[in-house]
């Protein structure tokens, strides 16, 4: 399967939203299992709505470049990047691959493309934030395989 990475276009929004919601469903299931039920419901009353809005916002933002992975005319994944030019840090801000095509190198290809783009934009460090829950384990393996190193961070929540 030949995959091309090209700039996101507005007509691809529905496909990007659809694949991202499918890709992130196991992640939110995992988060729900790890968090106190009341806290989870407070933070994510309807994660699909909030994630849809987040993807729409990222795809519309002029300062957030987005690329899509295309094969056989279908959008199979996307990556969004944010730059912080003061410390020269580029961030893999969003990444998702159609679940049926995960594990085939599409996510890695999107990340490598984004890293090359960041280098060309003058960034000297790349970062990505991801969850420590089981649902994010495949993402963590991919980032580590591509040379990212983890900085452990603990985040605690309590229902008030």
Sequence positions of predicted segments:
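Conserved beta-strand-loop-alpha-helix junction that forms the acyl-donor binding cleft
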Residues: 102, 127-139, 157-160
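Conserved residues at the C-terminal ends of beta-strands
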Residues: 82, 129, 154
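Helix-turn-helix-type domain boundary/helix-start signal
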Residues: 6-7, 104
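Extreme N-terminal starter segment of soluble prokaryotic enzymes
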Residues: 2-4
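Active-site acidic-Proline motif in GNAT/NAT acetyltransferases
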Residues: 83, 98-104, 135
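Acetyl-CoA-dependent GNAT
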Residues: 7-93, 98, 111-112, 117, ...
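Conserved acetyl-CoA-binding loop-helix of GNAT-fold acetyltransferases
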Residues: 97, 103-116, 141, 145
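Conserved active-site alpha-helix within GNAT-family acetyltransferase domains
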Residues: 108, 120, 124, 132-152
């Amino acid at each position: 399967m030949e995959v091309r990475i090209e700039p996101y276009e507005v007509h691809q929004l529905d496909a990007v939203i659809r694949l991202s919601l499918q890709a992130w469903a196991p992640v939110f299931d995992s988060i729900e299992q790890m968090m106190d039920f009341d806290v989870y419901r407070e933070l994510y009353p309807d994660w699909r709505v909030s994630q849809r809005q987040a993807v729409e916002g990222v795809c519309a933002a002029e300062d957030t470049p987005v690329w899509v992975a295309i094969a056989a005319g279908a959008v199979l994944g996307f990556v969004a990047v944010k730059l912080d030019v003061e410390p020269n840090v580029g961030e893999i801000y969003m990444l998702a691959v159609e679940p049926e095509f995960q594990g085939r190198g599409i996510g890695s290809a999107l990340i490598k493309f984004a890293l090359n783009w960041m280098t060309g934009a003058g960034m000297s460090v790349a970062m990505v934030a991801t969850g420590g829950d089981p649902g994010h384990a495949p993402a963590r393996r991919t980032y580590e395989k591509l040379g990212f190193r983890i900085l452990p961070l603990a985040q605690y929540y309590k229902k008030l």
